[in-house]
Amino acid sequence: MQAGPSPIEWTEDGRPRFILYGDAYFGADDGLAESRAVFLGGCGLPGAWTGRRSFTVGELGFGTGLNILALLDLWRRAGPAGGRLHVFSIEAHLMPRDDAARALAAWPELSELAEVLIERWPEARRGFHRIDLPEFGAVLDLALMDAGEALAGWDGRADAWFLDGFAPALNPDMWREDLLQAVAAHSAPGARAGTFTVAGRVRRGLEAAGFEVRRA
């Protein structure tokens, strides 16, 4: 069974938008700055991995891969020498390779990382796909399937979570309380999660799952 390719259209200012939900993959101002502030900063990185030889990040909503490139960029600059970064990311609708390359070209500072990721971009085939990134001391496990199924099939625990599904009003399934409970069950002690949304239902769902919610 094939994971459905992501139907993309482009906004006038050059951002990819997912037609099914009518939502852009990142904000109009600066998607990279947004990723760094919301997800890296929201998860206390790089401080959270201080003194660690390995670190695991989980993500709901791989999208263009921008969050992961921002993470890899920080890891290569501020990660532990010889350390290992493991990323587990979930995406139900993988963006076509050419569209991802077009989207990521907006940030030349990430070009080295982007070229490697695009070169190893998997086929849109339902299942778990491992992308080895030894030049950056990292490995990416990309689950192309429903988030609930992906979490049920993963035996890991994340030290940090990037919760980056489309807006709750447009994609409520990504923010279901049972899904947030599963995220909590796959979290290491002291794990932190970053998310762009301040929707009340998401805040309540995170609190019910055991997270302490604070606005950054």
Language-model segments: residues:
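Conserved beta-strand signature within the Rossmann-like core of class I S-adenosyl-L-methionine
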Residues: 160-162, 187-197
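Rossmann-like AdoMet
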Residues: 1-58, 72-112
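Conserved glycine-centered beta->alpha loop in an early N-terminal alpha/beta scaffold
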Residues: 61
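A short SAM/SAH-binding and catalytic strip from SAM-dependent methyltransferases
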Residues: 159-174
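Glycine-rich SAM-binding Motif I of class I
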Residues: 64-69
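S-adenosyl-L-methionine
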Residues: 101-154
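A short glycine-rich, Lys/Arg-flanked "PGG" loop and its adjoining helix->strand segment in the class I
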Residues: 173-190
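Conserved Class I S-adenosyl-L-methionine
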Residues: 203-216
